[in-house]
Amino acid sequence: MENHLPNIFYFPNCVTAFPYRYTQKELDDMKPVDRERFKYAVFPLIKHRWCRAYVVRDNHTFKLNVETSKRLRRVAYPTLVPLVGVNAALREYVMEDGTKISFECYSYLICKRTTSLHDVDDSTIRGLVEGGNQLNIFTNSVGSVTNTVGIFGNPNPFAKVPLKSLHPSMQCKIFTSWARRVPVVLTGDTGVGKTSQVPKLLLWFNYLFGGFTDLSTLTFEVQEKPIVLSLPRVALVKLHSETLLTSLGFEEIHGSPVSLKFGNMQERFVNTRFSRYGIVFSTHKITLNTLFKYSTVILDEVHEHDQTGDIIIAVCRKYIRKLDSLFLMTATLEDDRRRIEEFFAESVFVHIPGGTLFSISEAYVKNSNDPLNRFMYIEEEKRNLANAIKTYTPPKQSSGIVFVSTVSQCEAYKQYLSERLPYKFYIIHGKVQNINDVLSDIYDNDGVSIIISTPYLESSVTVRNATHVYDTGRVYIPSPYGGCESFISKSMRDQRKGRVGRVNPGMYVYFYNVSELRPIKRIDFEFLHNYVLYAKVFDLQLPEDLFVKPTNVTRLHDVIEYIRSFDISDDVWTRLLSSYYIHILEYAKVYARGGSGALALDSFERTGNLTDDALDAIKSLNMRAKILSHKKASAHTYALRCKLLFGVYAGKVFTVYHKRPLTGYITMIAEHSFIPDY
């Protein structure tokens, strides 16, 4: 019983469930099993109404102070003797000694001395109904959307949400999984409301029932914590928090149950009146440093295998008993299900059926060239793309999204297509600062808009008038001092396809052979020092405790030994990880020393502003590379072939670009930037 969600506590999606106030007459007419549902109202009452309640006497009737607007003095609890009369109109009982007591006051006193929900009887349920009505926590299949105003202090009504994720049957499944306190893996096609609705649903459950060890024991000792939706990028934090905030009837963050956590936050994003039961939208790095401050941890975009996200999963597995619940959300399990089943001994898989609201058609445009013949393959791809946009053209006032792999390709493809097609072209990727302005121009365009983007648009921004996707099927995978281009994975294909079909029927045109799709093991292309450093902080065993293990374990051990050579204590590493970005491992030496150099370097990592102090701090690390050769790359650029002379990757040959043909040595400032050694 305790793990099943009574239908009177469904989240009001304003389609199948609405706020509702139950009368005592309705309660009397119910079957006993239906009256039992109201017992669970005791938990939100303890948290949100009775937490500030005390007994008063109002015209010879004992009440709770929260039942009246009068300023009455606290009085001693009355002695509870058998009830002999019920006045439903006045909502009060008469006890055997003639004392009058309100339904809610009686329930409050009974629950104060009761430890089992099983012992709550019909007389007590009357007061729970009255208190629950005041909190506006009950729902019914009939009602009005306007009644959602004020549930969380919201000035406007909740949004109407017809998505599958808030259907009553899915609410029950998700609640049962949440209440079991085992890891939950939530899947569902793009467009069913995983990210936009499930966190809102878990916020509702946390508001009602969070902070209690179980839902069969009565206690006024509540360990309330917020929940967190952890995301890989700041853009996602802003996007999804704004969506949830608006859907809950808020126009601003202040005083709402929503809080944001990301680096360099402006004051306008700070909620100074955040509720303890609320939801935090956080970047993975900040989540990792504050993990145990939350009751429920929700990790989104698990299929991306963001490095910090995978570390969070590893830490959660080791300390799962410190969390009330863990939700892993992903569009598809095709690449990860077996590993998740191995990694978590106990886990529940919940799938939200259905896809986007509108159908999505597909078209395949074959490239006759071998992808290994890169020049010929790309040239034909451009021609195919131009012809496909002519054939499968978005309607006026709509847009199409072209997915390419790099920022430089965005520029090249825009130039090629704009010379051949009479449409407006736009570029969106993670380095574009004014994305909202670009989107405004797209929405204001009465004609056809074509957006060229990197994988950034797979999830970071929703383009609401997008009807077509043109997918080259490629992604650039960075690696230390280099990188390579690869075909995408099945989960990335699903994400890209799901960008359309939300407000209108969609079209997905792809230019690659689906047989090329395969999982991408990102850990094999990454700097590994964060895995090692957070293993120190959280006492993880490497590589055994990692969610995804590197193929080359020797490289992992090389990193462990290199970090040991820094001679920095574990306590200092813990402090550094919670205070600095440390994009380049060697920066930790500067941060450990402290002083003005550390302050300047920290500012550089956060803002990109390279001051003289920051430059001097970096130079002190002797991060040099030898220039092996150079050649002209373009009219104004030279490619410098270099060999790294420091760190775990010493000896690696890589390429950087400069406006002049250099010889000698360079000093690396960051992974892809440098200064010449003159």
Curated annotation (Swiss-Prot):
Statement: the UniProt record of this protein carries the keyword Transcription: yes
Domain Helicase C-terminal: 371-546
PROSITE patterns, A to Z: DEAH_ATP_HELICASE, HELICASE_ATP_BIND_1, HELICASE_CTER
Superkingdom of the source species: Viruses
Presence of keyword Chloroplast: no
The Helicase ATP-binding domain, residue ranges: 175-351
Protein name as catalogued: RNA helicase NPH-II
